[in-house]
Every structure is written in C-alpha cells, then in structure tokens.
C-alpha cells in the first residue's frame, strides 16, 4: 500500500496536532477546548480520507487488538479509554463508529482519531457508524458544533471524509465487527467488499443494515426495528450467519448497555458501548474489549464519573 497518508502530511505538524489535542488532559484554567485551526482540521480530513480509500471497505485485521464502541463526542472519556488501553502505538485499536453527535466535544474526538489514523495507518482503525452520515449528524449536534466553532463548510469536509470510512472488519477470519449488525442481504462476508466508496448511507439495504440493525431477544428471524430504520434480528440469525461464514463472534456497538458490554445469542454476539454516563442521562459504564493473539476476549470497564465534576 502506498503510504500516501503520512507522506502527504508533515510528521512534525501531525505530532504537534496530537500533542495539542492530548494537552487537554492538563488544561490551563478556563480552557475546555483543544483548539486546532480550520486548515489543520481540513488537512486531517483530506489525508485520512485518502488512507480510508486506499484500505478496503472490509478490513482484515490480526489480533491483538482493542475494540471500542460508541464515543459520541465524550472526549474526556476517549482520553480515559486510551489511559486504560494504552495510548497509540502501545496497542492496536479498532473503533466501531459513532464518534460525533450528542456529546460536547465531537470535534476534538474526531480530530484525535483521524490524527492517530494518519500517524499509525496499519495499527489504528476506524469503522463507520450511523452518525457518520450527514442526514443524522446534521440533527444530533455535530453540524451545530462545526457551525458554532468554525463554519458549515468544515462540516461538509467531514461529510466527505465520513463517506469514505470502512464499514466492517474481520479479525483473524473469526470475529466480524461492525457498528450496527447483520442484514438479510448479507449471506457471505465477502459481499461487504463490493460496497463502493465514497458513498452516503442509503435508507435501506446492506450498508444501511450494517450501520443500523439491532439484535433482539423478542424476535426469531428478522423483525421491525423501533428506530424506523433497518431490522432487528434474532439469535437464530446470528448462529446461522456464523456457521455459514465459519466465524465465532459478531462484535457491534450502536446500543447503550449498562455494563459497557453485553452478550447475546449464547455469547455469539457482543454489544460494545464506550461512552460512560451517556449524555449525562444514563448511568451506564463504558467498555474496552481486548482480543489477544489466541482470540480470547477480555473487558476493561470505565465506570461513569460524577456528572457534576466531569467537565471541570
């Protein structure tokens, strides 16, 4: 693979951007935002976009790797995740999408993730979530944050980058990872390789389902989804898919779970959620899943912190 990524961004500039974003851990009195300028953010978007397009839509990764679920602009919690799991390149990472919206610092969150993607393109991976889509993040906070802190044109630059994100990953041919879940159109995992990018997220079909579907204990086969988008699927569909594709586990995000992770279908599917105390409205923990070389999965838990102190 041509190293367009690092080669088209001055490493010293990139390191300085990462340093400033990480300095948020020790903020000076009164500074709550790690400010990058418009051109720096655009460069992160342009360079990472090229890397996403050079790498496949279905990533094929090797363990060990640490997997994270939804972050939703909770930047201080993203930094806590890295403190638990090790700041790159101390560990390999796979994030399952939903970096923006709802939280207060979507810009810091996505900028740090894109910067790490550029710096460590073969060790740091980002999948697309349903919120990495213009029609969704126009409504749930990211558009407003871009407009308030920069301008609408910058939001459009992010949209172009999000349209190039990969949508699924396979770890050592045995663990399938995506943001949402399975699809009635997905028979063979190889089909995901045929999704062409850049692309918006359609209202129905394989790409939509990979980003939007949910497992349900109340369904056998496929059911209606209360979200009004995609489907729900039963434990039978998880087992059927894994047998057909000779795989062991589906790892996905997309739903708040109380303990940060939750198994389904006799531990054949796990839901990961990595934004503790989500939106300040839930008392959920966040989790980080470590997959070792033998594909053993273990979990590190981020307990919710006191809401009153979390942004001070």
From Swiss-Prot:
N-acetylalanine, modified sites: 2
Binding positions for Mn(2+) 1 per the UniProt entry: 70, 72, 98
Q: Which CDD domains match?
A: MPP_PP1_PPKL
Q: Where does it localize?
A: Nucleus; Cytoplasm
Question: Bound how, and how many: what does the cofactor note say?
Answer: Binds 2 manganese ions per subunit.
Please cite one Gene Ontology biological process associated with this protein: cellular response to abscisic acid stimulus
According to its UniProt record, which reaction does this protein catalyse?
A: O-phospho-L-seryl-[protein] + H2O = L-seryl-[protein] + phosphate; O-phospho-L-threonyl-[protein] + H2O = L-threonyl-[protein] + phosphate
Q: Which GO terms describe its cellular component?
A: nucleus; protein phosphatase type 1 complex
What Pfam families does the annotation carry? Metallophos (PF00149), STPPase_N (PF16891)
Q: Which residues form the active site?
A: 131 (proton donor)
Disulfides per UniProt:
none
Task: Please state the Enzyme Commission number of this protein.
Answer: 3.1.3.16
From the UniProt record, which GO molecular function terms apply?
metal ion binding; protein serine/threonine phosphatase activity
* Cofactors named for this entry: Mn(2+)
Q: What does this protein do?
A: Serine/threonine-protein phosphatase that possesses phosphatase activity toward para-nitrophenyl phosphate (pNPP) in vitro.
The name this protein goes by in its record: Serine/threonine-protein phosphatase PP1 isozyme 5
Question: Organism source for this protein?
Answer: Arabidopsis thaliana (Mouse-ear cress)
